[in-house]
Swiss-Prot record:
Membrane-topology annotation of the record: Multi-pass membrane protein
Protein name: Fluoride-specific ion channel FluC 2
Protein keywords: Cell inner membrane, Cell membrane, Ion channel, Ion transport, Membrane, Metal-binding, Sodium, Transmembrane, Transmembrane helix, Transport
Transmembrane segments annotated in the record for this chain: 4-24, 38-58, 72-92, 103-123
Lineage of the organism: Bacteria, Bacillati, Cyanobacteriota, Cyanophyceae, Synechococcales
Gene it is expressed from: fluC2
GO molecular function, a single term: metal ion binding
Catalysed transformations (reactions): fluoride(in) = fluoride(out)
Compartment(s) of residence: Cell inner membrane
Annotated control of activity: Na(+) is not transported, but it plays an essential structural role and its presence is essential for fluoride channel function.
UniProt organism field: Prochlorococcus marinus (strain SARG / CCMP1375 / SS120)
Amino acid sequence: MFDGLSTYKSFFLVAFGAVPGAICRMKISDNLFRNKHNLWGILLVNSSACLLLGFFLAKQNYIHYINNDQPLYLLLCVGFLGSFSTFSSLILEIYYLFVDQQWMELFLFTFTSIGLGIIFISLGSHLFNA
């Protein structure tokens, strides 16, 4: 992944993108959905991250700087979207549902999250494929 750049520059780009991604995730989740277990916030953030990732995937063929070893890819796709999307929060909420034996919510949330992720990455790729 880091073949085109020095390792330190690659790490810096990922970190530089990760900080605003994490802040955006926190602001969206906290401001829109204030309860402790915010399944809707996680769905919103992850779906929008998948939509943006679909956009970048669609543009990879046309914009050299979005290829896997390029600065823009590391900054936006790995850094920003990697910290903006909330896989660990997703798993934590699934765990809470499991521990609380809320089986219907667990399966609904899990499959909705995965399904929306696939739909939104496909939608982003389709909408922005030029």
